[in-house]
Each structure stands twice: as structure tokens, then as C-alpha cells.
Amino acid sequence: MFQKPKGTRDFLPEEMKKRKTIEKKLRKVFDSYNFSEINTPTFESFELLSKKTGDEIRTQLFVFRDHGDREMGLRPELTSSVARFYINEFKNTPKPVKLYYFTNCFRYENPQAGRYREFWQMGSELIGSKKPIADAEVVNMAIEGLKEINMDFEIHIGHLGVLKGVFEKYNLSDDEGNEIRRLIDKEDMDGLKSVLSRLESEKNIEISKKVFEVLDLKGGKEVIPILKEKLADFESSVAALENLDSILEFVPHDYVINFGIARGLDYYTGMVFEVYGKKEGAKQVCGGGRYDNLIELFEGEPSPAVGFAYGFDRIMLNIDDFEVENESIFVVPVKSSEMLLKECLKIAKTLRDSGKSVEVDLMGRKLNKALNYANTKNIKKVLIVGENDIRDGKVSLKNMETGEQSLIELKDILNI
């Protein structure tokens, strides 16, 4: 017997209804900010996908060669694809360009709860504005989406420029700075201490104290002036703190300032944020930030950009279970006859034309078995079509929750 590939899932109808319900609510928030939906190819050139993704994600790419011997990969996330799409299609569009997407992505990693080899992301990219209010709009939209689905969460916001300013002050190379960022992202404090100790010995500097002063300070907006004082001699770090302060002026929500957010992707340049669900062990359900150099790196015009993505599967694990109301109507004849079946189809078409979901009995069941079928499908309303009733322009409406049954006029059928 064939089995689904490791790290993938089949979604049953009830699960799909729940996913569609949450998707619809999140789309409503994106649409309310006038973001436009796009989609991109499932696979892109390996060169594009690997250019600025980070070492860990690069090793997780699904890679193949096409019949023209070109190296391709399945998308591990969407930002690189959207940047390429922007260069191809939107570079002459008035700014800002506001785009969103909902699609599947692929990474070859060890499957576990909330982590799969095929997974879904829903996210947005705002391209063309470097103003703090643009960063704030993206943060606010991410927060409001999670509030729309009643998820319990905590958002942490930081700025990569703070630590980058420290690295610059101590003359660290980009590779050395990126190594430190990756260790912070993995929360490998032992590895971080080891690397900092080695750098102190090699360069005769005292960097560890400053790095941990930045990492250890967490809280509300009051931490910004505290850290500005501690980093008064670090000009770039102070500028980053002032930029973050300006962004947070436009964020009227609760948040935790956390400069330990490093993000696993190498293209972020400024403000970054992560959202953690409180239900499943505080796992990350959303992340994003500013990436001002990515489009230029892909040979486009310099274009500031900021965006985020929800891990849709993680979100589904973090919301309380709920039942999606089945609003379908089941139409069944009292007995199997060509005349009654034709009447059932007429009634079904009338209801469908008005936007209702309707199922007609296709099995020729006896009435009791048809009603049992409706119960198993959690259908609340059943229309029973009989010869005498039809001649009188009526049908029976049975409420499957209460068991009540009444005759209604066919002309009133759209009101049920």
C-alpha cells in the first residue's frame, strides 16, 4: 500500500474546513490594509533560493536538475521569490508595493509537531518605503491577524543594527558577525561564549560584556534609553535604537523588546520581530523584519522592504479547537423516482444559484438511511421532497438538531 511521503500530511475534510476558516480571517486582515495577493512558482533557480537564505536553510533545500540540466529548488520560503517577482513585474509600479501570499513551502528537515517537510506560509511584503511607519504597519498587521483568530501570543521586537553596531566598533568581519548571529538564533549560548572568547583573544578586545548587555536587556519601551546609555560610544547602535523607538511610536499593542532576535535568514538588515504562541510550548508562529538590500542583491534597483510570514501550521496548533458549522442543505426524495429526483435537482439549483451549499441524495437511499447519512455529515437542514407536497408547491423541512419537521412553500425556499 502506498503511503504519503515522510514529513507531509493528508488533510481530512473537517481539518480543511478549519484551515479555510482561519485562512479567510487572516486574508480579511491583509485585505483591510489593501495588500494584493500574488503567487509565485513552486520551484525557482537554486541560485536565487540559496543566495541569502542562511546556511541551515540552504542545506534543507529540495534540489533537482531539470531536463535542460539547470539546477532548481523547491521554495523554502517566499521572500526571495517575491523579490524576484518584484524586479520582473513591479519595479515601475508606484510605491509602496504591498503584496501578500498563501502557499506551500518545502524544507528537508526532521518532521515533528509543527515542523514538516511541506508546510504552509501566509505572509506579506511591503516594498518601497524605508519610513518607520512602514515597519509599524507590517508589525501591526501581523498582530491584528492573530487577534482576529483569537490566538494567545507574545510578540518580541528587536533591531539587528544594535548588535551590528557593536560588531563594527570592534572591527569584526561580516563572516564573524554572521557567525555570532547564527549562534544567537540557535540559542547556543555555550557556542556563543566560546566564539566571543576566541575573538577577544585573537583581536585583543573585550566584546563579550557588550554583547551580553544587549542580549540580556528585555522589556518594554523603557529599555531603549537604558541601552542607549550603555552603548553611548557605539554610534551605529544608538542610531538603530532610535530607529526602533520611532517604529514603536506607531505600534499600539503590547510587545517585548528583545535584541536576541537574530532570524535564521541572512537578508534582514534592521527591525526584526518574532511571535510566539502560548499554547504549544511558546513556539514561534510568525516572524519578519526589514530587508533593505535583498532586491539590489538580486540585480534590481535599491528598494527598501519589510515583511513577515505566518507559519500557518504552527498557528493551527496554537488556536483552540473549534467546530465549523455545516451550513449545507441535504435534499432527499421520499422515494426513488425519476420525477422526484428531477424536482430535487430543481430545488438544489435554485438554492445553489443563491449561494447556498446543497447536496442531493445520489444513492437512492430509503428516507431513514438518508437522514442517518445527514447526521453523520453533521448537516442541520434536510429538505424532504414528496409527490403530494410538490403538487401543492411545498416541501418538508426537517431540523436535524431539534427533530422538528414542517411544511414550507417552495416560493419561500431561499429563506431557510
Swiss-Prot record:
Key word Lyase present in the record? no
Gene Ontology cellular-component annotations = cytoplasm
Chain ranges passing through the membrane = none
What GO biological process term is on the record, naming one? histidyl-tRNA aminoacylation
Its keywords, alphabetically, are: Aminoacyl-tRNA synthetase, ATP-binding, Cytoplasm, Ligase, Nucleotide-binding, Protein biosynthesis
Q: Where in the cell is it found?
A: Cytoplasm
Report the EC code(s) recorded for this entry: 6.1.1.21
Query: Does this UniProt record's set of keywords contain Cell cycle?
Result: no
Query: Out of the domains of life, which is the source?
Result: Archaea
Please state what class of enzyme this protein is: ligase
Give one GO molecular function term. Answer: ATP binding
- Kindly state which reaction or reactions the protein catalyses: tRNA(His) + L-histidine + ATP = L-histidyl-tRNA(His) + AMP + diphosphate + H(+)
Subcellular location, principal: cytoplasm
Q: Which NCBIfam families match?
A: hisS, hisZ_biosyn_reg
Family to which the UniProt record says this protein belongs: Belongs to the class-II aminoacyl-tRNA synthetase family.
Indicate what this protein is called per its UniProt record.
Histidine--tRNA ligase
- Organism, by scientific name, is Methanococcus maripaludis (strain DSM 14266 / JCM 13030 / NBRC 101832 / S2 / LL)
The beginning of the lineage is:
Archaea, Methanobacteriati, Methanobacteriota, Methanomada group, Methanococci
Gene symbol of the encoding locus = hisS
